[in-house]
């Protein structure tokens, strides 16, 4: 069915979001059109404000509205460990379990030879720079249990082991192919408690 141009454009915009197909995009577009002008304006303002005000922490790469982020400036955290994750959503998932008390490093992707993504294409150089001060004794790799997650963890291990840094991986309480952001808190807690050395 053909829709008027404004709604067709809105459907197209929604369908560009991850996990949103045409049917869901159409539903969201029609829902948005049915909202009050005030609610639509608030939605648009919040969207623009988030895009304008959020940045990536210059230390760890986490999404923040302050740079450096509140985690990196928290001196009560364990300075001897860094937990490496794929993206900022994974930091939030790990913080929910309230069991990990060190710092984080966000890669903003994974090494993916099949997709032409190499170590220089993700946020790895700044991790190595962070480790130069000698305070960190353990790096916990918390990438997803996928082929790309495994490739990334093995690369990190190969690079860091010669420097005498202990490199561990989350335990396999996480199902192969699963995303950390969707794991329940008990599973994440078990995975971090039973991590294995690489």
From Swiss-Prot:
Keywords: DNA damage, DNA recombination, DNA repair, Metal-binding, Zinc, Zinc-finger
UniProt superkingdom: Bacteria
Classification via Gene3D superfamilies: 3.30.60.80, 3.40.1360.10, 6.10.250.240, RecR Domain 1 (1.10.8.420)
BP GO annotations: DNA recombination; DNA repair
Alphabetized InterPro entries for the sequence: DNA_Rcmb_RecR (IPR000093), Rcmb_RecR (IPR023627), Rcmb_RecR_Znf (IPR015967), TOPRIM_dom (IPR006171), TOPRIM_RecR (IPR034137)
Residue intervals of every C4-type zinc finger in the record: 57-72
Domain Toprim, first and last residues per copy: 80-175
Protein task: May play a role in DNA repair. It seems to be involved in an RecBC-independent recombinational process of DNA repair. It may act with RecF and RecO.
PANTHER family documented for this protein: RECOMBINATION PROTEIN RECR
UniProt family annotation: Belongs to the RecR family.
Protein name: Recombination protein RecR
